[in-house]
């Protein structure tokens, strides 16, 4: 029965992984989450909190125009999209090396210095953040559904390794099946097992929804088993086919979704800087609207929105990392640094469903393998490759659901078309943001409670 409050009510899981935004960058100012007012924020070796990222006070002779700050630090600063072109900020480095130097073995003091080295005078963008005025649709999702404020990307690195965790929980650290994968480079075809293949073997339906422009983010295309799949096979039909725009919406509205859907954005809709959050919001809204348009589909569907990694954008929470030598969690190929694979920095994750309504926060520690483990819980299909450390460290998303709470009506969300049109205009007509100088202002997090999911009467 609809609203009975149990795992078996869920018939469809839709997962959309967008690109390159950190949690603090989007939601550090959101009330009731672990944001800019975090009482547990760590202290740096300078004696300041982690938000005071060390910055050169004077420019070196070799680069006299390098960004400096007389305060010796740079605080998070608002990217005001109403008065500047800040909907379209440049990307900052999220390469394996610079992600690890930003993390700095857990000291968390390298965000500005690493990105000045990698990106020159665009480096300070690492500390920029948005407010509700700048990304109203994203905030509306958080205010109406459940946001995860301890969700980490899986790898201290870029898109490809993180999306490999998204579909396989693995980057082949010992280099026996085409890896290790620490960068976005065309590989020898990968040969380890993916979760979609495990679903196929178990007879569980799934589909990749992608257009011809998939921004090279469907990493299944890099696997030998998919590259060699016959045109009529499940691996090809579900994993490699491209669709015209609107196919997912049609399938959702006509109750034809598979058990698992993975959505792939186009480049423009991906939210990867310098593409706009507003274009991403319009894309996300179209998917949620299609699910909600059919009450029967809404009543049995979970939509998970997450982000592959943080770009080079600051987040203040120290990611969980394993002890040195943990099997499957360090790159062991000769010549590689003895760095952990992850977890990476926090990224946004919002779960949209009848059982996650109410503006809740889920604070269990998650990463990209958590979505796979939720599918494992739902389907009974075991994830290949996932390490014991990942299973012990990151949850399976179940704690984000409030099955004890009877679902309410689908909330009304703000429109996205007007916001997108305004964003396009502002990007083309307003000046670029300026970076703070001396006498900086500490970022303000809005106040207010945020309830946690209630699962007490009907446990998963």
Name each region found by the language model.
Residues 1-460:
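N-terminal pro-sequences and low-complexity stem/linker regions of secreted or lumenal proteins
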């Amino acid at each position: 029965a609809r609203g009975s409050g149990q795992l078996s009510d869920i018939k469809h899981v839709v997962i959309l992984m967008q690109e390159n935004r950190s949690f603090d960058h989007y939601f550090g100012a959101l009330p009731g989450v672990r944001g800019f007012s975090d009482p547990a924020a760590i202290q740096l070796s300078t004696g300041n909190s982690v938000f005071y990222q060390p910055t050169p006070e004077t420019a070196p002779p070799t680069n006299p125009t390098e960004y400096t700050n007389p305060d010796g630090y740079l605080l998070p600063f608002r990217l005001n999209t109403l008065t500047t072109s800040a909907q379209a900020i440049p990307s900052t480095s999220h390469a394996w090396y610079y992600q690890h130097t930003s993390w700095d073995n857990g000291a968390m003091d390298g965000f500005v210095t690493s990105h000045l080295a990698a990106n020159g005078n665009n480096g300070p963008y690492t500390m920029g953040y948005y407010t509700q005025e700048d990304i109203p649709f994203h905030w509306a999702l958080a205010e109406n559904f459940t946001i995860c404020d301890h969700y980490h990307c899986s790898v201290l690195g870029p898109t490809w390794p993180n999306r490999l965790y998204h579909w396989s929980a693995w980057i082949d650290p010992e280099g026996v099946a085409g890896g290790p994968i620490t960068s976005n480079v065309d590989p020898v075809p990968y040969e380890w097992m993916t979760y979609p293949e495990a679903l196929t073997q178990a007879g569980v339906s799934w589909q990749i929804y992608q257009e011809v422009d998939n921004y090279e983010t469907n990493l299944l295309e890099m696997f030998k088993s998919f590259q060699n799949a016959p045109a009529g096979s499940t691996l090809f039909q579900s994993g490699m086919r491209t669709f015209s725009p609107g196919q997912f919406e049609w399938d959702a509205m006509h109750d034809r979704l598979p058990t698992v859907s993975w959505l792939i954005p186009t480049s423009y809709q991906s939210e990867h800087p310098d593409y706009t959050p507003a274009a991403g919001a319009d894309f996300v809204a179209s998917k949620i609207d299609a699910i909600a348009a059919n009450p029967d589909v809404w009543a049995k569907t979970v939509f998970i929105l997450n982000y592959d990694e943080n770009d080079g954008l600051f987040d203040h929470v120290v990611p969980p990392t394993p002890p040195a030598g943990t099997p499957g969690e360090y790159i062991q190929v000769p010549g590689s640094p003895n760095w952990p694979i992850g977890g990476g920095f926090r990224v946004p994750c919002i779960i949209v469903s009848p059982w996650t309504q109410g503006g809740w926060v889920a604070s269990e520690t998650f990463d990209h393998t958590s979505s796979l483990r939720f599918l494992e819980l739902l389907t009974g299909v075991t994830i290949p490759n996932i390490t014991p450390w990942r299973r012990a460290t990151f949850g399976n998303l179940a704690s984000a659901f409030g099955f004890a709470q009877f679902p309410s009506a689908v909330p009304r969300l703000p429109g996205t078309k007007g916001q997108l049109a305004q964003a396009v205009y502002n990007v083309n007509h307003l000046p670029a943001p300026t970076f703070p100088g001396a006498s900086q202002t500490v970022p303000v997090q809005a106040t207010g409670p945020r309830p946690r999911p209630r699962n007490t009467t009907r446990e998963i």
